[in-house]
């Protein structure tokens, strides 16, 4: 990767879960909490919660990632209770367990990613481009990540969502560089890699287990399995 002068990071899935889709982390949390539903039932409640969060303002700007997770788990488990798949009486108890498990998992991933982010921060300007709920600044501050990023481009704030390439164009604009001089690091082929390449950016796809088998089957010359491989690719 030559002539890179700035870097755009995705957040969720890229920095906080080693490229693994967040549904998989939450599913692991369900196992820890001994929530006895099928994977199909879980995926249904996961989608329900995502749509509810998009439709109704539950997440406020001051909420950190634990706050977000607890709200999300209450919605997911509430849905399962409404479907008579779990007992309403256990919703709060189990929501607390899953939220804590997921928050701890995210913090561990963030700390693993920190040396790489730090190394890149020392060499390049960094911008974060994320589909998020309007609270990514609070999430970053809680994980002590905010200072690494020159600017944050968040979907809920700018009114553009991935995979619209315009959200990456805003990130490039924030770096005051040409797209060809920018490396985009993300975990989603459809939401990060394709739109970033559409506007001419270089890419690094941190590929973990995705949401669908179709995405898992996709290949690309710029796949990395760990975030720190970016350091090698950039020759740092």
List each language-model region with its residue ranges.
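Switch/coupling loops of ABC transporter nucleotide-binding domains
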Residues: 124
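N-terminal helical cap/lid subdomain that shapes the substrate entry/recognition surface
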Residues: 2-114
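Asp-based, Mg2+/Mn2+-dependent phosphohydrolase catalytic module
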Residues: 1-9, 40, 87-92, 114, ...
């Amino acid at each position: 990767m030559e002539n890179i002068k700035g870097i755009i990071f995705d957040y969720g899935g890229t920095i906080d879960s080693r490229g693994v889709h967040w549904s998989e982390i939450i599913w692991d949390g369900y196992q820890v909490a001994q929530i006895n539903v099928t994977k199909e039932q879980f995926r249904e409640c996961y989608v329900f919660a995502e749509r509810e969060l998009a439709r109704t303002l539950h997440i406020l700007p001051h909420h950190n990632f634990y706050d977000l997770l607890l709200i999300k788990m209450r919605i997911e488990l509430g849905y399962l209770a409404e479907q008579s798949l779990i007992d309403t009486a256990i919703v709060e108890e189990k929501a607390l367990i899953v939220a804590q498990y997921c928050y701890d998992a995210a913090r561990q991933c963030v700390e693993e990613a920190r040396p790489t982010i730090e190394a890149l921060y020392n060499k390049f300007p960094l911008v974060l481009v994320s589909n998020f709920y309007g609270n990514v600044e609070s999430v970053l501050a809680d994980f002590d990540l905010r200072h690494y990023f020159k600017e944050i481009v968040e979907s809920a704030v700018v009114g553009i969502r991935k995979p619209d390439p315009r959200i990456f164009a805003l990130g490039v604009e924030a770096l005051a560089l040409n797209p060809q001089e920018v490396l985009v690091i993300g975990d989603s082929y459809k939401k990060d890699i394709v739109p970033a390449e559409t506007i001419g950016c270089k890419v690094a796809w941190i590929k973990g287990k995705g949401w669908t088998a179709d995405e898992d089957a996709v290949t690309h010359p710029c796949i990395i399995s760990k975030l720190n491989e970016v350091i090698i690719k950039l020759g740092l």
